[in-house]
């Protein structure tokens, strides 16, 4: 019996539906989103590469993100690139990581989830969106899952 047949049998024999556990590989595969370190690298605009922050943090990614966020905070307030975002979001600033979080959210909101349909994944995406699941558990920030499963 193949794994597909085995899983199908298990799911058919259960009264409750399945939960999907979705990780970052999902967004990387279907919409080309960077890894966490790749996403942080995208916002290294202050003259220091991501490797500088990673090295300063002794390889600890959350600490590297905090160091980057501190530098980005200062950059965000003074950069013409972000002047419109500053006007729109300055009331949301709660700490030195807020500016980076805002701009990551802005970047993710601009991603086109329909790209997954154009990149050879149409059949997979359509199959996934037709699943009847009881819930989805994820830490992903992008909106691709919301598009696939609008009722959750």
Regions flagged by a language model, labelled:
Residues 1-152:
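Conserved catalytic-core helix/loop/strand module for nucleotide-ribose chemistry
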